[in-house]
Curated annotation (Swiss-Prot):
Superkingdom, taxonomy of origin: Bacteria
Compartments in which it is found: Cellular thylakoid membrane
Pfam families: Complex1_30kDa
Subunit structure comment from the entry: NDH-1 can be composed of about 15 different subunits; different subcomplexes with different compositions have been identified which probably have different functions.
Segments of this protein annotated with the region Disordered: 1-21
Keyword NADP attributed: yes
PROSITE patterns per UniProt: COMPLEX1_30K
Official protein name in the record: NAD(P)H-quinone oxidoreductase subunit J
Gene source species: Synechococcus sp. (strain CC9902)
Gene Ontology molecular functions: NADH dehydrogenase (ubiquinone) activity; quinone binding
GO biological process: photosynthesis, light reaction
Family the entry assigns: Belongs to the complex I 30 kDa subunit family.
Length: 193
């Protein structure tokens, strides 16, 4: 028996060119389909590990798309955060929305209802000062969440009413959750106090 890959493609082992084309043609989820009918430009991303629809948007149109999905029933910002794809790679800002009013209405009426949820992602260059518009004006719950993302990753939120650090001291240098962060020498910090 050979250790090499099978030479004949099967449904479970497609040919390499079939695999590449399958990845390139993701099926848009229901929110993405709705955004298409409304004329909003966005990217279809793979669903997450539990099947939540994920959509990529440009930072300039983030507030417009957030307002649109809010009017489409996604009335609750469950969480906002960021992550670093790795040294030299992009920073990512994500927003997870759920249709809370629909869920409450269904539960009150005793009807089974599957929770509608969607996650928006904005991909940012780590060069310079990454920034995007704040959605605080649409969702007040974004206040501390955007501040934490700024504090840990250095992503600025334009138009945020309280643009200051949340967890770290105001004079802290750097962004502690970035993969390229160089931690200050612990003993030098200890001597400062």
């Amino acid at each position: 028996m050979s250790d090499s890959a099978p030479t004949n493609p099967t449904p479970t082992n497609p040919a390499p060119e079939e695999s590449a084309s399958a990845v390139a043609t993701l099926e848009p989820g229901p929110v993405s389909q709705w955004l298409n009918t409304q004329g909003f430009d966005h990217d279809v991303l793979d669903p997450d590990h539990v099947g939540v629809e994920q959509i990529g948007v440009e930072s300039a149109v983030l507030p417009i798309i957030v307002a649109a999905i809010k009017s489409h029933g996604f009335d609750y910002l469950q969480c906002q955060g960021g992550y670093d794809e790795g040294p030299g790679e992009r920073l990512v800002c994500f927003y997870h929305f759920i249709a809370m009013a629909e869920q409450v209405e269904a539960m009150t009426a005793g009807r089974p209802h599957e929770l509608r949820e969607v996650r928006l992602k904005v991909f940012l260059s780590r060069e310079g000062t990454p920034s995007l518009p704040s959605i605080y004006g649409l969702f007040r719950g974004a206040d501390w969440q955007e501040r934490e993302t700024f504090d840990m990753y250095g992503i600025e939120f334009e138009g945020h009413p309280h643009p200051k650090r949340l967890l770290m001291p105001e004079d802290w240098k750097g962004w502690p959750l970035r993969k390229d962060y160089v931690q200050p020498d612990f003993y030098e910090m200890q001597d400062a106090f």
